[in-house]
Amino acid sequence: ALCRRGLKLSDLPIDRGVAYLLQTQEADGSWYGRWGVNYLYGSFLALRGLRASHDRTASRAIWKAGRWIVSVQNADGGWGESCASYGEGAFVAAPSTPSQTACGLLGLLATGQVESENLIRGARYLLDTQRADGTWETTARIPEAGSYRLFASPRRAGTTDLPASA
């Protein structure tokens, strides 16, 4: 987005953004999310930013994040994460959803894993769960009580936009 506003990849705001992402990566390779649930969402967005930066110092972080995304893929090929991950401060697995599967797929694509078996399994999950009208089932997840995350309660997790972008 900054590049579309006229900044060059070598400009200070880009360098600072890359440095921030590299400093805030979790030990397991993921990133904490702020607006979506949670580590899958944060990781896919961080990876997109790092990939767009073309910063060579980010290659290890990108690789590590790709390994993490693969490690949390569900047996059905999709991805899912519980809202409890906010309270736990770590990824909490949940049944696969289309929106979180999209985050997993988009994250893997950002790592450069464009022909991996994990990517194929995730895409198959989305195809298998897509309705005849092209949409996916929408589920509601309610974040833990007392959390500022109640801004969108119940939170819609499974809208058509994110899965369709994957």
Where are these regions (language model features)?
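An alpha-helical repeat/solenoid feature that recognizes helix-turn-helix modules
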Residues: 1-19, 23-166
